[in-house]
Structure formats: structure tokens, C-alpha cells
Amino acid sequence: NSPLAAEGPATGLERELLQPFAEQLPDEIFQADWEPPRTEDYRALRENLIRAQRLLEEAGWQLEDGVRRKNGKALRFDILLASKGFERIMAPFVYNLEKLGIDASYRTVDLSIYQRRMNSFDFDMMVYSFGQSQSPGNELMNMFHSSSAERAGSRNLMGVSDPVVDA
């Protein structure tokens, strides 16, 4: 729903920019339209959970007594929320993670605590909305460039530090 949205496989200047990184990227970038997983009904959700289970196992996370473990360490994380309104969204998400053997929990904190923890990257996962202008520009460097990955207060909350993204 934007003239700036990518459609289909990479072509033209986009393909030229990404070509040096082809070995590091999924083939779909150059061959097909990417589609995110869908969960319109229980069958699609079940298929996604089966795929997630397979990916976890391929990455070395085995199910032991109902808990995903790798090298003896349980797969667990906390989700930081700034509003109780997100709890109704997180509850089914955490429930589905539990089906996979992932020990996840969520916690709503005061906005000032949320902001402080966000600015110092003191979280495992959080809910955050990245506002964009109609014509994205320099703000993308602060959100996704390696130079901002460890800079306190940046909006690179994911810690993205990758030459492919920087290109």
C-alpha cells in the first residue's frame, strides 16, 4: 500500500545492490515474492508451529521434558510491555511458544521504566512501533544501521549490525 513497497523479486538497482551478498541471502529475494506466514485458521497456525519446531530442531534446540534446550540451557525470554492493552495480544503468543517448549513470559512496566530499559537495551523482547515518514530517509540509519546497533538511545532496538542491511 505504498509506492515504496517492494514487489516481487529484486530487480534493477535493488538487485545490483544485493548481488554481492547473494550467498548470504535467501534465494527467494532474487526469485520470488516473499509472503509472511499466515494464521487465518487453526490449520495454518498448526502448520506454522510444525515449521517452527523443525527450524528450532535444525538450530540445535531439542525438546527435553517439555522444554527446548541447547547445550543444557533452556530457551526462555521475557517480553517487555508498556501498556496493559498488549497483554491480550501477548497471551496467545506466549501460549503458542509454550507449545514449542519455549519458556516465555510478558510483563507490563511503567512507561518511564520501559523507556529507560529500551534506551539501554535492557530487554529480551519488547513491543514497539517504528513510525515512518511518507518518504523514509536518514531515520533508517538510526533504526537499522550497524553504527547505531550499540549506541544507547538509538532506535536500532534489535541490534542490527550486518553489512547487507548497511548496503
Question: Predicted segments — roles?
Answer:
Residues 1, 5-8, 12, 16-40, ...:
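Extracytoplasmic/peripheral linker and loop segments enriched in polar/acidic and small residues
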Residues 49-55, 59, 80-93:
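Bilobed "Venus flytrap"/periplasmic-binding protein-like clamshell domains
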Residues 73-83, 104-107, 124:
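Short, well-ordered beta-strand elements
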